[in-house]
Amino acid sequence: SIRNSIDKVNKDVSVNICRWAFPGTWARSIARSWRISPDIRPRWSSVKRIIDLNLYLSAYCGGGHYNDMDMLEIGRGMPRNEEEVHFGMWCIMSSPLMIGCDMQTIPEASLSLIKNEELIALNQDPLGLQAYVVQHEGEGYVLTKDIGRRRGTERAVALYNPSDSACHFNVPLSLLELGGRVRLRDLVRRCDLEPVSDSIVCDLPARSLRLLRAEGLYRTDPVAYEAEWAYLPCFDALGKVKHQVLYAANPD
């Protein structure tokens, strides 16, 4: 097989599986990443669809393995707000980042976005985790993940409005498992926000994202448990083999 041949070369080679959908847990033994969607296009409907497909695949990311959301379409004609959603969600979901535009003609605003060191650092966080959904009310989604260290006091948070109208967010800090006075930083605009003690409240316009780094005084116990976070050890998208249902922890 290709994998066996690569192993014989004794080089650090990254293998990506592309079958336009999450292939199954078997992919971890073969590849470092895998595509989870059809090919991306430089339009909002395509970006939104890929995010939708990856919202509940966080259990399969980690330990040096990643859900590949396809290349970046930054600098290819989408408006600023949609580009911020595109790049920000790719970063917090730990997707591989591959530039898909002509670097000689990319607009300055688009170039500054993909050069944002704080967003790149989020994507390259050593934990390599993918953000997961902790709140979905109306059209808005709230995603979070640990950064720096597991069960630490620092987390990344995305308030994501994919709809065509404004969306109100009220996110209790208990959902983010952070306690005390929580410091907030806007990673897209690279500025500090007012600290909060109870909840994060904001209104977002259509097709927009608020991407935050939140640092609390201490970590609190989880208050939400969702079946969509589960790791299914025998998941096989090919559907050729019937497996007994097993319950196991994520290997990472």
Residue ranges of each PLM-predicted region?
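Extracytoplasmic/secreted cell-surface and envelope-processing proteins
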Residues: 1, 24-28, 167-168
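Short, well-ordered alpha-helical packing segments
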Residues: 1-7
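Glycan-recognition surfaces
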Residues: 7-102, 123, 135
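Catalytic cores of secreted or luminal carbohydrate-active enzymes
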Residues: 85-134, 208-226
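Carbohydrate-binding surface patches
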Residues: 90-93, 98-100, 136-178, 207
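Short, glycine-/Ser/Thr-/acidic-enriched flexible segments
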Residues: 104, 127, 149, 162-165, ...
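Surface beta-strand/loop "capping" patches
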Residues: 133-154, 223-242
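Extracytoplasmic
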Residues: 178-184, 192, 198-204, 208-252
